[in-house]
Amino acid sequence: MTRTFLNLPALLLAWTVIVVVAYTPTPPKISPATNRPNQLYTWRKQQIRYQQAGPENGDPVLLVHGLFVNSDHWRKTLLGLADEGYNVYAIDLWGYGYSSKPPYDSPEARAVCGENKRFADDESLAILRDVPLGNPSGKGERVRDIELRHPVRSPYNFFTWSELITDFCRQVVPKRPVTLVCNSIGTISSLQAVIDTPDLYTGVCVVTPNFRELHSAEIAFPALSMPVVRAIQKALREKGQPLFDALAKPETVRQILKEPYKVQDAIDDTLVQVLLDPLLSEGASKIVFDTLSYSAGPLPEQQLSIFPDDKPVWITYGTSDPWTPDKRVDALINKPCVEKVVPLPGIGHCPHDEAPELVNPFILEFLKRVKPKDEKEAQ
């Protein structure tokens, strides 16, 4: 008994190492999507995969991916912006791609959580009262309370990811203001990063926002419907592995992508491979179901209402996106920080991969808009 007690620190350390190694996938040396080296950044003892392209003295840009994908989803943007002289980074958010995926309830994961300090001193900060939100019609507003804390206190949340973005920009990107380009739910992490640390960023270019239809503030009659939703979420977390195994196959992934992608030719073998391979790594399925249980956190209209006015936001989106109400996106132009909203007819949820010939010029125009004044004058 005494020997076991004395060895306890060593046993705990060994167990931590085992957990870190087991839930830290090894990426290929070269990304098959971009032909760029996969690089690793150690963040809070976690592995974060990222890619970089373009001259290091170029204006820095960070690409932030959306739900269940990874930095390879920016394959056409990373290289397109780099060819124009920008220093471009694309990151795998913690829990996605080839970044670490420890179990959400492990001590290792809990230590990383971005909610730890944010709500520690005042629990009342975890709920925003009477927040105006948009409607699918784009007309009028609904007033809702917004729960900010993850319902099961998972560390895989927007506050954690926003802190990762900021730490990455401070520690990896050359010390210059960074422009964020984001897709889908990557928008929420990106907006939060700028809200929390505005001096580090020039602005945000949004390629399709996400209104998070599973959020408790977005679901109709939440007092009645949320208990049912959370029961389903709990069942998926606990017993969803067979369903995940059935869906995590190349042909199934290809079929699933046909819903958000309206430009079907963009769904090639490389896309299927680079999205599926990391999802087959240890711990990935648990992160998928954990994310589907995330019915709280910030919402884009709430964030844009408190966004720094001197940090421009431009938005583009596909009008054929089945998940994003176009009129509600158009209404975001009424937020003071939003300078431009551009619809792309016939494009789906992933315009950067479906129509890079339209999206890359839009991003490049935004990058010129936010270029530091002294650099503009020097040109």
Features from the language model and the residues they span:
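Active-site loop/oxyanion-hole signature of alpha/beta-hydrolase fold enzymes
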Residues: P37-R44, Q51, L93-V181, P361
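Short beta-strand-to-loop junctions in surface cap/lid or active-site-entrance loops
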Residues: I48-D59
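Active-site glycine-rich loops that stabilize anionic/oxyanionic intermediates
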Residues: G58, G66-V69, S184-I185
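Serine-hydrolase catalytic-loop signature spanning alpha/beta hydrolases and amidase-signature enzymes
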Residues: G66-K76, V88
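Flexible "cap/lid" loop of the alpha/beta hydrolase fold
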Residues: I188-L191, I195, L200-G240
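Conserved alpha/beta-hydrolase catalytic His-Asp/Glu region
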Residues: S216, G240-F307
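Conserved loop-alpha-helix segment in the C-terminal half of the alpha/beta-hydrolase fold
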Residues: I306-I347
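Catalytic active-site module of serine/aspartate enzymes centered on a nucleophile-bearing elbow/loop
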Residues: C337-Q379
